[in-house]
């Protein structure tokens, strides 16, 4: 637990510094920064009466702000910022939620009217819990800076009503090891920070945003434990994107897996995301839209394609945990300052909406947890699905600049935009369905699988040595990728289920699908799942052509 004073305090003149820096954001003249200035000046008047003096003029400026956005925060910067925030404000608590490959503790600020930062205290509050994550790719640093700025605003008394309904879990630096591997050439054409940024993978060489299902990294296991113990209702994952030269300052995505609970998809697509987009446009004059890149496939016309439905990705994984997840992708070719502000504005509007709709958020999550998926036909594989009609996409342009230190070419967003109508591939349609069983039987000798299931928070129970009618998957063939990905050669199994009977052996465990994580369990254990344990090769030694998949199941009707 962090040290706390008796009341929230924040140096008044530092709030003024923040106003001046934000007012320079290009394209915002007379809009967002003006209203933001008025709000912060009101905070100045309030905080000027506080009896605490700042230790320095830069006490709560981020490294990005102190260096005029030439640099980004180090791991030590972030830890120090969060610890000092906890020492200054009674509503900010400092803790950690795990470790990196190289042993760095993963810092977490827990913000709200709670007694301490423990999962028990947070869950006992009965409030909506929101997890905010930055820096899963350590070259994409805008979220790391924006979350520190958000904390500072909360300390200054802004958004005080959020504490009535929410507890925030703020994790600015998830890929902490990658963050410390700074070079001037990481993310080559990204426009700043010119002083360098970290690398995409962690210290093991893993892309942490592909590790949520196989959880081979300590970081992925740490965040899975956080999801299980704190059980946030909403999660926001903050990135920077590049690719297509569009005119959006930020693009976003809900969970994309077809097995995402429909109520979560509707809440985001029909409610939160359109509302937030409109608020950003009205307040700041910037356009946001669904994540995508414009390109042509097979010689056809260009279309707007989202990324991938598989739950190895953070927001898709969280959707299969029955939670509301949002991906944020600030535009790489905007200036570093604009990317940070675009991310900050996005998070603020999300939190405003969640605050106003807290009862609905908690009900959607509770209903998804209570609903059994046993007997449902869920997707094992999927393909992008074309929109019924073309949509208007705002395209843009860039100008090339030279990196001031290396001379390498950089791209800078130009203040131009035009509309191009194209089909959108923003959702996914199942290509292979399977009925969810009642339960899976995992043999005792598959200890690694049992350990990984437990790491995800899946509930397991001992199997009694009583004969039971089951289905076993008979393997017709196995296709193995020639090249490794994430250190593993992915595998595709072909075959079909056959009825038979087994008697569980000592140590065998049941994983029942009638549990809140039933959707996730299904994707992890089904042999033909495109992102399950079989896909990642964890069962390769047990697979034989003509043999059976070692994990059997009780059919779901």
Which residue stretches match the model-derived regions?
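Structured catalytic-domain cores with a bias toward divalent-metal coordination
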Residues: 16, 36-38, 50-557
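Serine residues within intrinsically disordered or low-complexity segments
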Residues: 23-25, 35
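Sec-dependent N-terminal signal peptides
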Residues: 40-47
């Amino acid at each position: 637990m962090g040290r706390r004073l008796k009341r929230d305090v924040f140096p008044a003149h530092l709030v003024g510094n923040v106003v001046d820096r934000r007012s320079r954001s290009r394209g915002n003249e007379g809009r967002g920064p003006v209203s933001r200035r008025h709000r912060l000046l009101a905070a100045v008047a309030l905080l000027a009466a506080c009896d605490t003096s700042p230790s320095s003029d830069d006490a709560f400026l981020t490294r990005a702000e102190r260096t005029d956005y030439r640099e980004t925060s180090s791991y030590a910067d972030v830890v120090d910022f969060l610890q000092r925030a906890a020492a200054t404000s009674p509503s900010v608590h400092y803790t950690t939620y795990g470790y990196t490959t190289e042993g760095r503790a993963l810092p977490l600020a827990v913000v709200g009217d709670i007694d301490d930062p423990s999962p028990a205290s947070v869950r006992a509050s009965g409030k909506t819990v929101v997890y905010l994550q930055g820096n899963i790719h350590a070259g994409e640093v805008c979220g790391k800076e924006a979350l520190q700025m958000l904390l500072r605003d909360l300390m200054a008394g802004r958004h005080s009503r959020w504490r009535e309904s929410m507890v925030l879990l703020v994790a600015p630096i998830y890929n902490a090891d990658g963050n410390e591997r700074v070079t001037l050439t990481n993310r080559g054409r990204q426009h700043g920070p010119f002083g360098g940024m970290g690398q995409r993978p962690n210290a093991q060489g893993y892309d942490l945003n592909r590790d949520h299902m196989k959880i081979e990294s300590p970081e992925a296991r740490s965040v899975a434990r956080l999801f299980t113990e704190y059980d946030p209702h909403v999660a926001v994952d903050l990135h920077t994107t590049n690719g297509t030269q569009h005119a959006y300052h930020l693009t976003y995505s809900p969970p994309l897996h077809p097995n995402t609970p429909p109520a979560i998809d509707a809440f985001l697509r029909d409610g939160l995301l359109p509302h937030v987009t409109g608020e950003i446009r009205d307040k700041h004059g910037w356009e946001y839209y669904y994540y995508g890149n414009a390109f042509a496939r097979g010689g056809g016309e260009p279309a707007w394609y989202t990324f991938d439905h598989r739950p190895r990705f953070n927001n898709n994984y969280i959707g299969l945990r029955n939670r509301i997840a949002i991906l944020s992708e600030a535009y790489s070719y905007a200036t570093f300052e604009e990317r940070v502000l675009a991310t900050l504005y996005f998070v603020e509007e999300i939190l405003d909406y969640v605050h106003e709709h807290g009862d609905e958020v908690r009900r959607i999550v509770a209903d998804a947890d209570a609903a059994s998926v046993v007997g449902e036909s869920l997707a094992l594989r999927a393909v992008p699905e074309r929109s019924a009609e073309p949509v208007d996409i705002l395209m843009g342009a860039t100008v090339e600049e030279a990196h001031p230190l290396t001379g390498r070419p950089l791209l800078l967003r130009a203040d131009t935009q035009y509309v191009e109508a194209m089909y959108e591939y923003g959702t996914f349609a199942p290509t292979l369905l399977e009925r969810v069983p009642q339960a899976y039987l995992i043999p005792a000798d598959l200890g690694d699988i049992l350990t990984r299931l437990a790491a995800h928070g899946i509930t397991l129970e001992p199997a009694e040595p009583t004969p039971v009618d089951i289905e076993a998957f008979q393997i017709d063939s196995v296709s193995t990728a020639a090249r490794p990905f994430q250190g593993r050669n992915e595998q595709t199994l072909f075959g079909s289920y056959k009825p038979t009977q087994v008697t569980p052996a000592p140590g065998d465990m049941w994983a029942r699908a009638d549990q809140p994580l039933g959707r996730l369990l299904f994707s992890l254990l089904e042999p033909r799942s495109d992102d399950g344990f079989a896909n990642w090769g964890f069962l390769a030694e047990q697979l034989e052509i003509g043999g059976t998949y070692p994990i059997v199941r009780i059919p779901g009707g």
